[in-house]
Structures are given as C-alpha cells and as structure tokens.
Amino acid sequence: MSKPIILTGDRPTGKLHLGHYVGSLKNRVLLQNENKYEMFVFLADQQALTDHAKESEIIKDSIANVALDYLSVGLDPEKVTIFIQSQIPELAELTMYYMNLVSLARLERNPTVKTEIAQKGFGESIPTGFLVYPISQAADITAFKANYVPVGNDQKPMIEQTREIVRSFNHTYKTNCLVEPEGIYPKNEAAGRLPGLDGNAKMSKSLGNGIFLSDDADTVRKKVMSMYTDPNHIRVEDPGQIEGNMVFHYLDIFGRKEDQTDIAAMKEHYQSGGLGDVKTKHYLLDILERELTPIRRRRLEYEKNMDQVLDILKKGSETARETASETLSGVKRAMGINYF
C-alpha cells in the first residue's frame, strides 16, 4: 500500500530563520522520521519571482542557502525529495490548464491574496503572475498528488482554492485523476508565528529582527542579549512583566518538557523582583544553542561540499519531474488532448 503524500516548501528570498524552524521545518523533520509519508519539499523560486521579478539575483543566491538550511535542520534526501520548482516545466503547463477553470473574480476574492496585495503596496499595478499564483500553487500540490499540505492558518484560502480546482477539473472532465488535498495547520498558533526579537508581531527577513539558522554562536549571543524584555524593569530588584517579554515568550516556545519547572520558577522570580534580564537571556541562550548547535554542525559539513548539495537538488528535481510528468499525462488524457 502506498504512503500518503505530503508537499511543502518555501520561497527562496533569503536565509531561513527560527520563525521558519518552529513554524514548519522542525515539524517536517518529525514527519519525515515517522516514515509514514512520501514527502516532497521544494524551493518555490517561480512563486518568488511573482513579486521579485526584477531581483532575480536574490532568488538565485538564496537557492543554495535555503537548501543548506533544509539539510542542516535534518531533512534527509534519502527520505525526502527536495527539488526546485522552476526545474519542473510540467507545473507551468498544469497551471495554464487550471487557469481556464478559475475566474478573475474568484482570484480577486481570495483573502490571502487581497491581504498580500495590500501589504506589498501594489495598488493598481498588480503583477499578473502574483494574482494567479494560487493557481500555480494548485499545480504544485496536484502534480504530486499530495494528500496533505502543512501550512499556516493564513494559507487556508489557498488550500480551499486548490480543492475547488480539483473538484472543478474532475467534474468537468469526468475523471478522478486529481487528488483533493487537506491542509495540516499548526496546533500551537503562537509557535507557528514566532515574534521578532524586537517584539514585532512576526520574525521577518526584511525587518532584520530574527535569528537565522546560519548565524554563528557569537551572532546568536549578541542578538539574544539585545532582545526586547520589559522596558520598565530597570533594576534587578524591580518586579518585571512576563507578558510581552520576548525572552519568556521564546522560553515558552523553545523550552522542552524537562525545562518547564525551571521556567515556571524563573517567571515567578522575575514577577516578584530580584531576577535580572541578563540572567534570563543567558538561560534562553542555552536553550536556543541546544537546538542550534547540531544544526550549525551539519551546515558546516555540507558547506564543505557544495557540489553534493547541488547534486541533491538536481537528483531531487529529476525525481520530482518524473512524478509531475505522470500527472500531466493523466490530465491531458482526461482533457482529450493527448493527440499522439
């Protein structure tokens, strides 16, 4: 019996950070190690071009960095197919066929797209590729017959749009060749969207308020020591607030079961006074380094042999293309356009 299929990926627009790690990467490794699924993980460079068309060098430079991030967190190319979206031309052809089943009005109603258009300040100059990228996502998902797609809650409209396209295609062409996917959403929404070190609602590459998976130990230390805490906690003996204090927020997310007694005691001590921010930050640093040290070690090993990293991407893309080609053939048969 074949395993259920999972598809997931990232836009290669820069290095990945702790927000990506707790939001998706760590869970991908757990799913991989369960050995219950066939997994495809991809670098969505074509999607990144929808709002970086004039900055393609950023995407090119990011491919290797994101691949290193994948491998360093523990994704295993022997267990997971890692590929580059643009190396699978079948995805673009599938997108074209699906576009004929989706109205412009439906795309414009997609709440995720509407929010992102406003955030990016496109105004009336919306790139066509950006507006239709939910259809491209549907092609990505259906090409690999994904049963499950791990995404954040903000991506629920994208999953629903893919499900609509699958139902429309299968009904129109009287087939069942496309698989209707299900989203896998974060159980802990707080962990799924890690705030920035400065207390900003989201850790972001553009805001420069994150800890990158590629940061060395000294850089991580400096960033942790500059974290936002309680601005009114001026003296050690002063009572402090843990609400909105990023150090305690991070401890809640990164602390393991065996850390909970110490963290609870620290919270009580901090709130009653007598515990300084330097001590809490050093404790958090130890917790973070417990996660980051093995990641950093694996990254250094892969950095010594970038030819191996590129070979992993090349072989993964070849494997992925075989699967996508089979799906495309089935789609064309259903449509009656397999002429020869």
From Swiss-Prot:
Binding site for ATP: 11-13, 19-20, 152-154, 194, 202-206
A single MF term (Gene Ontology): tryptophan-tRNA ligase activity
Motif ('HIGH' region): 12-20
GO biological process: tryptophanyl-tRNA aminoacylation
EC number: 6.1.1.2
Pfam family, one: tRNA-synt_1b
Similarity-based family: Belongs to the class-I aminoacyl-tRNA synthetase family.
Name the UniProt record assigns to this protein: Tryptophan--tRNA ligase
Lineage, opening ranks: Bacteria, Bacillati, Bacillota, Bacilli, Lactobacillales
Gene: trpS
